[in-house]
Structures are given as structure tokens and as C-alpha cells.
UniProtKB/Swiss-Prot annotation:
One of its GO terms (cellular component) is extracellular region. Glycans are attached at N70, N156, N404, N464. Belongs to the GMC oxidoreductase family. Gene3D superfamilies: FAD/NAD(P)-binding domain, Glucose Oxidase, domain 3. Its EC number is 1.-.-.-. This is Neither inactivation nor afterpotential protein G. The keyword Flavoprotein applies. Its cofactor is FAD. It is an enzyme of class 1 (oxidoreductase). The keyword Cytoplasm does not apply. Oxidoreductase involved in biosynthesis of 3-hydroxyretinal, a chromophore for rhodopsin Rh1. Not responsible for the initial hydroxylation of the retinal ring but rather acts in a subsequent step in chromophore production. May catalyze the conversion of (3R)-3-hydroxyretinol to the 3S enantiomer.
Length: 581
């Protein structure tokens, strides 16, 4: 009877799987069916607000203006709708390098990425409504007050302290049931983290189980949270699959944007939201750099494109001597995995596998760092190499048991939360959408190396603790040929105390960026305290490029909060203008 029931379950899994594939394909075919599209006859209309880019900031801002403004709103987006595939959390990586990803690559890195092809990092950026919020790993961050206070203290931004931003961060947080928190008893790994929290209570470590922007097993991005509820409003129009090529400035009497070139059409408008590459292509930036590209300068802002920052990670694989459950190929191919997901939105398909993290915000001058726990035992070689740009030997050194489809384990990811390294973004030529020159300049600061080593040492302390002992963990120190002079030596596999030189070598060979870029249109240097482009009266920048310093966590929620605040200023200005008439 048991075997018969099992066969029925297997058959049911196959049938449901087939039906789900049909649904996904149908969603993919319908992905460009954007509602409320700007009609050809409307292309000569004047809009009160034009928002360029439907990413996290753009979608949030569009929602608030369409809902609360008396003016007309046009949202221009280079892509269309993401398909249903993007809604399934565990399939996030399959969205990268696809039609909804700009698929940028960094320039060859000088201080890192030696184990990557051409020493170039993959830099996914979303193309479509929701932008990178439909490519990211859906992790929510409540914010860290000292991040904002440092803007106030070090960048003369008195309007951006935690006291001013706390309410906007709270408003950015989705309410139940639009959030998923990993349960304490989700797996043996989460149970170990729970025990470690009690064991290390004397340390300054903060333990967090992952919070996801997931509802009923589906990604709940800014599209679902903000844009969809207003998408049919009469004062809103959308223009998908459209590239903005240039914004035109003119003095009247102050310098302001007067028109934008979209494809072959000009759309007149009053208030606009833009970002870095478009600014450069429009002749706004460093005049000498623009001249070399043959771009006529309209407005001098020398710091456009500078101050690029991003988090940088070192992943380490830890095998377990017990059954997880952790993500591996056998788990994913089990029919019950699909049945559980389709029936209740639960199980491995219902989140991305990041189960929790541990952070130290530092003290007595120590830099803050984070440790993330990704519950994956078997890493698919072709999938990860495609989205990471790893060379084969580097991947196989990091994940020596990748070929074992039943491998149990997890990946511990160490990173510096406030990296000091700074890079830049520039244009290869005057054509904006050619692959831009993105140089994160990872690990150019020795402080970042020291900070990440501290994170790794703490991660090892956690894995070696009695709280993790029941997992029978074993850290697999990568055998990277170029690092062999420094380790790993046999003793390193017993005491888990490899040298700093070895850890630094690992970082510079197999470390990866976090895809958290920001800073290139920074508050205080490129935009003013109300996000207005300096010297231009009616252009604001509302995305992660305005962050003057890194966020000590995932930045998506902070960008939502920034957009909420920008909307409050814009709506207040509209109200004041109405009162003065």
C-alpha cells in the first residue's frame, strides 16, 4: 500500500509539474502585456511628472504620485513585464543573464576577481517593471540607524538622520501577509543558529532569521506592493520597451529640464527622475570626460559617476554529516517539493535558501561585518558559473562536492558591511546603452581585507561552536593553485585557523560582489538634500545611486524609503504651488 501511494504521489508531482510549466510559459508569453500604455495620440501630451525607470525607486515613486497627485504621471521603462518565472523565489538565479537583465560586466578588476574570466564580475541589473527588485534575493532589511546618522555627521546631511528616516523605513516594510520570516525550526541549520544566539550572548553579534518579500510562496516586489494597485489610474500612463536617450536643459530663468528624447519622440514635462548613465549621455557630468567622448556638455557636475560602492563577499562551503534538509538536486527533484510548493507555497521553492545572518556593528573602532548562511549543499556548476563568471578551477575549488546531488551542507558568506573601496561608472562611448565602464574597484582598500578576515574568523568560530556540533560540519578550505604558498595546509582542516595571507589570497581570487551598487549620484555631492540634481531645478534622482555610503544590509528597502520621502517632498511642493495660485 505504501509503494502504491508513493507512486500516486510521484504521478501527481509529474502532472502538477507539467501544468506549472504551462502556466510559466503562458506568463512568459504574456510578459509584455503592460496595461495603461501611452497611446500614440498621447505622445505629444505634456506630463506633470515623468519618471525614467520602473525599478525599486521608480515604481514606488510612480505609485505615490499617481495615487496622491493632481498631476499626470508618465513612467518610462526600457523593459516590459517580468514573466511568472520571476515570481518563484528559488528560480531567481535563472532570471539573470536573461531578457530581463542588462547583464553588465565590470571592467577587469585590479585588486580582485583573479579566479573569474578576464577578472570581470557579473553585474546583473533588472530590465522591466520592478527592475532589480525582480532579480534580487528578496531579503528585507529594517535599516540601521547609525548608517543614516553617518550621512548627517560626515556629509552635512542634517535632513537624513535616523530620526528623520525611521518612519519612512517603517512604511517601506511590507505588512503581513506580504512578508515571510524563516521559522526557527525550519531546518537543523536554523536550529543551530538559534542555539548559537544563546551561546554567544556575551558578544556584540546580532542574529537574524531571514525576512523575505514573499507572499504565499511568490515574490512580492515593489510591483505588487506599490505599482499594481495604481496601474489603472486615469492620471497614469506607462511607456514600456522605450529607451530615453537624452534630456535637454535650458535656462528659464533657472536651469531646468525642458524635454527628453524617447526613441524618436520628445515628451514635454515639468518634473523628472533620472540616474547616472542618462545624465552622462545628456552631457551632465565631468566636462573634460564628456569632451573626450564627444558629448556636448550641458551642465558641469564633476562627481557624477564617482564614489561607486558595493559589498564584497567570500563564500565558503561547509559540508554536514547529517541530513538537512538543505538545498540539493535530490531535494529539488523530489515530487513532494513541487507538491508542497504548489499547495501551500512552502518548502525549498518558497524562498531563496538564505536562512539567516549574523552581524557585528563593531565597537571601539572595529569595522562592522556580516555573516550570511545559505542552506545549499549541492551547487549546480553550470548555473553558478553562468551568473558568477567563475573559471572552472575556481568554482571547483570553492565547491569541491558540486557533483554530489545528495550532498548536505551550507555556504557561509562573509562580508564587510561598510567597505572603504570606491570605484566609478563611465561611458564607453557616447551611446549610453553599450556596456558602461563599471569599475567597483573591489578590495582596493586594505581596510576591507582586514574587515573581511574578521568576518571569516567569526564565521569559523560559529561553525566550530557546540551549537553547530550536531551538524558535524566540515569547512572546505578552497585549494586555489595561486594561493598554495599560503594554504590550505593539513593543519588548517583540523584547527580551521589558516593564515591571514591565505584568506586574503582567497578573497582576491574567488570573492564576489553583492550586487548592491550605489553612490554614483551621491547626496550632498551630485544631488542636494532633497534629491534634486544640483543646479537643475526640476530633476531628481531617486535610486541607490544617491546613497553616499553603503547600507549595512540589503539596500532595497532603503531605496523604497528614499522614494517615499521624495514623494512627500514633491507632493508638498505641488500643494504649496496650488495654494499660491
Amino acid at each position: 500500500m505504501g509503494m502504491k501511494f508513493q507512486k500516486i504521489l510521484v504521478l501527481a508531482g509529474i502532472v502538477i509539474g507539467f501544468l506549472s510549466i504551462i502556466v510559466v510559459l503562458a506568463g512568459t508569453l504574456l510578459k509584455n502585456s503592460v496595461p495603461n500604455v501611452l497611446a500614440p495620440v498621447e505622445r505629444h501630451f505634456a506630463f506633470d511628472y515623468v519618471i525614467v525607470g520602473g525599478g525599486t525607486g521608480g515604481s514606488t515613486l510612480t505609485s505615490l504620485l499617481a495615487k496622491n497627485s493632481n498631476g499626470s504621471v508618465l513612467l518610462i521603462e526600457a523593459g516590459g513585464q517580468f514573466g511568472l518565472l520571476s515570481r518563484i523565489p528559488l528560480l531567481t538565479t535563472f532570471q539573470q543573464k536573461g531578457i530581463n537583465d542588462w547583464s553588465f560586466l565590470s571592467v577587469p578588476q585590479k585588486h580582485s576577481s583573479r579566479g573569474l574570466i578576464e577578472r570581470r564580475q557579473c553585474l546583473p541589473r533588472g530590465k522591466g517593471l520592478g527592475g532589480s527588485a525582480n532579480l534580487n534575493y528578496m531579503l528585507h532589511f529594517d535599516g540601521h540607524g547609525p548608517d543614516f546618522d553617518s550621512w548627517r555627521d560626515h556629509h552635512n546631511l542634517s535632513d537624513w538622520s535616523w530620526a528623520q528616516m525611521r518612519s519612512f523605513m517603517a512604511a517601506a516594510k511590507p505588512k503581513n501577509p506580504d512578508m515571510l520570516e524563516i521559522p526557527r525550526r525550519y531546518s537543523k541549520l536554523t536550529e543551530a543558529l538559534e542555539e548559537a544566539q544563546a551561546q554567544f550572548a556575551y558578544k556584540d553579534w546580532i542574529f537574524r532569521r531571514s525576512l523575505y518579500n514573499i507572499r504565499n510562496g511568490l515574490r512580492h516586489s515593489v510591483v505588487q506592493q506599490f505599482l499594481n494597485p495604481v496601474i489603472h489610474h486615469s492620471n497614469l500612463r506607462l511607456l514600456p520597451d522605450a529607451l530615453v536617450k537624452r534630456i535637454q536643459l535650458a535656462p528659464s530663468p533657472f536651469l531646468q529640464a525642458t524635454s527628453i528624447l524617447v526613441g524618436i519622440k520628445d515628451e514635454e514635462n515639468r518634473e523628472k527622475e533620472f540616474s547616472i548613465e542618462l545624465l552622462m549621455a545628456s552631457g551632465i557630468g565631468d566636462v573634460s570626460a564628456l569632451k573626450k567622448l564627444g558629448i556636448p556638455a550641458q551642465h558641469s557636475l564633476p562627481l557624477v559617476g564617482h564614489n561607486l560602492h558595493d559589498h564584497f563577499n567570500l563564500p565558503l562551503f561547509v559540508s554536514m554529516g547529517v541530513t538537512g534538509p538543505t538545498l540539493n538536486q535530490n531535494t529539488l527533484l523530489n515530487p513532494m517539493t513541487l507538491i508542497n510548493y504548489l499547495s501551500s507555497g512552502s518548502g525549498p521553492l518558497g524562498n531563496f535558501g538564505v536562512l539567516g545572518n549574523v552581524v557585528s556593528y563593531g565597537g571601539l573602532g572595529a569595522p562592522p561585518y556580516g555573516i550570511t548562511f545559505f542552506g545549499a549543499g549541492a551547487i549546480d556548476e553550470s548555473a553558478l558559473m553562468s551568473i558568477s563568471n567563475f573559471k572552472g578551477p575556481a568554482f571547483r575549488a570553492l565547491f569541491p562536492r558540486y557533483y554530489n546531488s545528495s550532498q548536505e551542507g551550507f555556504v557561509v558568506i562573509s562580508s564587510c558591511l561598510q567597505p572603504k573601496s570606491r570605484g566609478s561608472v563611465g561611458l564607453l562611448n557616447r551611446h549610453m546603452r553599450r556596456n558602461p565602464l563599471i569599475d567597483p574597484n573591489y578590495l582596493s582598500s586594505e581596510e576591507d581585507v582586514a574587515c573581511t578576515i574578521s568576518a571569516i574568523r567569526s564565521a569559523v568560530e560559529l561553525v566550530n561552536s557546540t551549537a553547530f556540533a550536531a551538524l558535524h560540519p566540515r569547512i572546505h578550505w578552497p585549494r586555489v593553485q595561486e594561493c598554495s604558498n599560503f594554504g590550505p595546509f593539513e593543519r588548517d582542516f583540523f584547527d580551521n585557523r589558516p593564515s591571514d595571507q591565505y584568506l586574503e589570497c582567497l578573497m582576491r581570487h574567488v570573492g564576489l560582489g553583492s550586487h548592491h551598487p550605489g553612490g554614483t549620484c551621491a547626496l550632498g555631492s551630485v544631488v542636494d538634500s532633497q534629491l534634486r540634481l544640483k543646479g537643475v531645478s526640476n530633476v531628481r534622482v531617486v535610486d541607490a545611486s544617491v546613497l553616499p555610503r553603503p547600507i549595512s544590509g540589503n539596500p532595497n528597502s532603503v531605496v523604497v524609503a528614499i522614494a517615499l520621502r521624495a514623494a512627500s517632498w514633491i507632493l508638498k511642493s505641488e500643494l504649496q504651488a496650488g495654494d499660491s495660485k
